[in-house]
């Protein structure tokens, strides 16, 4: 669809200097949540009574004692650790989990892990669970431990097909693969094939396990947003005959307590958003403040990161409007004025901007002033410079893309990717998320590491760009829009859309391998820093799995948000 004349109401069009200019409108759907979260008050937060808090602390201590108690059968504790992590409460027991898995690594490194004769090692579930938990913890365990489950032809034994739990554990373990691990690629193909068959054959016989398998095939643990996976797994875990009642009760209480905190944060953010009056001042932009907060929850949900969540959500929201100004509304001439104004970063530049850009520019500057006050009393701190530098570079990248569109330039795939990795905004958003971790974690050394363009961040931007383009390129090409990775790949390699998407997906798979390898010990930066990057990749994997769930937030994304921010768990 070609450019169309803006058809906004006259009252809104008065905000523009040239009301009859032709603009390439995207016609995004309005905010589906309206003022739902504005109704949350501080009194609602107080509904977590003292009795609930006391009960939670008592249960927490009981679980901690389970973790430090001696257990002769280590499989019991392995399953406990796995459940603690999958239920989203491991942040309460980080030291205990670290100590236990280090003990497991040291104790079993020369026995269970490397011996093909150890009888305990013949259990596929145990071996796969051990492998995944240790790799998640940064221990580079060789995938050769799975050789015992392969036949003389280098294929997994067909007898394993009867071990559904073992297959599921191996499937989850295979997603920890790095480069050159053909055995894990074989494991992924083998388990995926047979687990898909299991769902079709036995969904009525064992619906709970079939549901667990179905969820895993769609979103394996390694690529899942922790808070979403916890909500999902809580319903499955309570149906396990061997579930730990103490852990189950604690996890439900913890989920609901955190949900109240998240609702309070979102209410504050929605009030800030309402004061910006986005529907009136920026009617061309995606009104997605609740979705922005959901994105942030994917990056970090733990209570100690409350300030960081509020900062990051606001930056995502401002960056989203900026994206829509460059991508869906601003004329090339207007963008020629906005870009240098952002580079100057000076309130006096407001007078140079078109009327509709003025409130955006002021809001952006005020937001970063607020961030500066939050992270450091010294407004000239390196942390603040990094934050401001990120959005400056993002606007420059957006403008380079606008130049392509203005010239009707069709880049090669390589040329497109060099710029498109910058226009994801992911490097900027990841750096903002770091600021919410605190100076004790994000030191100047970490900021230096960030400035060097580490492979894990590049991998996250690749995942973001390619999954975004695969999901949204058809919608974007309905209007004047720069070519996506799909179109550029099709043109350069003279292939079909389906073939292009298959090849781009392979690059996403390689980016996940880069991500996994960044978690091998010794760590270059603190683990909380690496976890933010991993979680940003997980959010993209969730929101863009089937469609652009940020732009089109009326179906799947709405359900996910409802599960985390509206519906409490029955206790």
UniProtKB/Swiss-Prot annotation:
Entry EC number(s): 4.2.3.13, 4.2.3.92
Chief localisation class: cytoplasm
Cofactor note (record): Binds 3 Mg(2+) ions per subunit.
Entry GO MF terms: (+)-delta-cadinene synthase activity; magnesium ion binding; sesquiterpene synthase activity
Alphabetized InterPro entries for the sequence: Isoprenoid_synthase_dom_sf, Terpene_cyclase-like_1_C, Terpene_cyclase_plant_C1, Terpene_synth_N, Terpene_synth_N_sf, Terpene_synthase-like, Terpene_synthase_metal-bd, Terpenoid_cyclase/PrenylTrfase
Reactions it catalyzes: (2E,6E)-farnesyl diphosphate = (+)-gamma-cadinene + diphosphate; (2E,6E)-farnesyl diphosphate = (1S,8aR)-delta-cadinene + diphosphate
GO CC annotations on file: cytoplasm
Amino-acid positions noted as binding Mg(2+) 3 in the UniProt annotation, renumbered to this chain: 476
Pathway of action: Secondary metabolite biosynthesis; terpenoid biosynthesis
Tissues where this protein is expressed: Expressed in the rind tissues of ripe fruits.
Gene3D superfamilies the record matches: Farnesyl Diphosphate Synthase, Terpene synthase, N-terminal domain
Pfam families found in the cross-reference section: Terpene_synth (PF01397), Terpene_synth_C (PF03936)
This protein's UniProt keywords: Cytoplasm, Lyase, Magnesium, Metal-binding
Obligatory cofactor(s): Mg(2+)
Protein's cellular compartments: Cytoplasm
Residues that coordinate or bind Mg(2+) 2: 323, 327
Free-text note regarding domains: The Asp-Asp-Xaa-Xaa-Asp/Glu (DDXXD/E) motif is important for the catalytic activity, presumably through binding to Mg(2+).
Function field: Sesquiterpene synthase producing mainly delta- and gamma-cadinene with traces of several other sesquiterpenoids, including alpha-copaene. Associated with the production of sesquiterpenes responsible for the aroma of the fruit.
UniProt family annotation: Belongs to the terpene synthase family. Tpsa subfamily.
Name assigned to this protein: (+)-gamma-cadinene synthase
Protein source organism: Cucumis melo (Muskmelon)
């Amino acid at each position: 669809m070609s450019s169309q004349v803006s058809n906004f109401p006259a009252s809104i069009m008065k905000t523009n200097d040239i009301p009859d200019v032709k603009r390439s409108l995207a016609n995004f759907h309005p905010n589906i949540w309206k003022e739902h979260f504005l109704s949350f008050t501080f009194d609602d937060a107080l509904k977590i009574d003292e009795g609930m808090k006391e009960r939670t602390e008592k249960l927490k201590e009981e679980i901690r004692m389970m973790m430090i108690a001696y257990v002769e059968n280590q499989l019991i504790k392995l399953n406990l650790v796995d459940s603690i992590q999958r239920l989203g409460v491991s942040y309460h027991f980080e030291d205990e989990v670290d100590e236990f898995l280090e003990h497991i690594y040291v104790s079993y490194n020369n026995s269970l892990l490397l011996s093909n004769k150890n009888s305990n090692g013949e259990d596929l579930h145990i071996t796969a669970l051990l492998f995944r938990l240790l790799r998640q913890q940064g221990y580079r365990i060789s995938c050769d431990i799975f050789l015992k489950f392969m036949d003389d032809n280098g294929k997994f034994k067909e007898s394993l097909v009867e071990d559904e739990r073992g297959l599921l554990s191996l499937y989850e373990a295979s997603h920890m693969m790095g480069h050159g691990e053909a055995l894990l690629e074989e494991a992924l193909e083998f388990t995926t094939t047979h687990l898909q068959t299991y769902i079709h054959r036995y969904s009525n016989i064992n619906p709970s396990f079939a549901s667990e398998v179905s969820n895993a095939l769609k979103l394996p643990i390694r690529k899942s947003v922790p808070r979403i996976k916890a909500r999902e797994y809580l319903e499955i875990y309570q149906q396990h005959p061997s579930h730990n009642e103490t852990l189950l009760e604690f996890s439900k209480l913890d989920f609901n307590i955190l949900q109240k905190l998240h609702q309070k944060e979102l209410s504050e953010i929605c009030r800030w958003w309402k004061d910006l009056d986005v529907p009136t001042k920026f009617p061309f932009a995606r009104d997605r403040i609740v979705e922005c907060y959901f994105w942030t929850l994917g990056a970090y949900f733990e209570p100690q990161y409350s300030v960081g969540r509020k900062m990051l959500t606001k930056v995502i929201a401002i960056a989203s409007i900026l994206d829509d100004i460059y991508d869906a509304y601003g004329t090339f001439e207007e963008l020629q004025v906005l870009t240098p104004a952002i580079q100057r970063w000076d309130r006096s530049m407001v007078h140079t901007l078109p009327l509709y850009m003025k409130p955006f520019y002021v809001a952006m500057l005020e937001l970063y002033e607020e961030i500066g006050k939050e992270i450091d009393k010294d407004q000239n701190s390196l942390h603040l410079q990094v934050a401001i530098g990120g959005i400056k570079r993002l606007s420059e990248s957006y403008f380079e893309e606008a130049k392509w569109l203005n010239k009707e330039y069709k880049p090669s795939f390589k040329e497109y990717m060099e710029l498109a990795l910058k226009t994801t905004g992911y490097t900027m958003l990841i750096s903002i998320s770091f600021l919410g971790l605190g100076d004790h974690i994000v030191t100047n050394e970490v900021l230096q590491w960030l400035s060097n363009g580490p492979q894990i961040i590049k991998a996250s931007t690749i995942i973001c760009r390619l999954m975004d383009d695969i999901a949204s390129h058809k919608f974007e090409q309905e209007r004047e829009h720069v070519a996506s990775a799909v179109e550029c790949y099709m043109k350069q390699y003279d292939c079909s859309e389906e073939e292009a998407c298959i090849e781009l997906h392979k690059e996403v798979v390689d980016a996940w391998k880069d991500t996994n390898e960044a978690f091998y010990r010794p760590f270059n930066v603190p683990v909380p820093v690496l976890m933010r990057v991993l979680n940003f990749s997980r959010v993209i994997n969730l929101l863009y799995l089937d469609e652009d769930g940020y732009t089109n937030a009326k179906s799947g994304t709405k359900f996910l948000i409802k599960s985390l921010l509206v519906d409490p768990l029955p206790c």
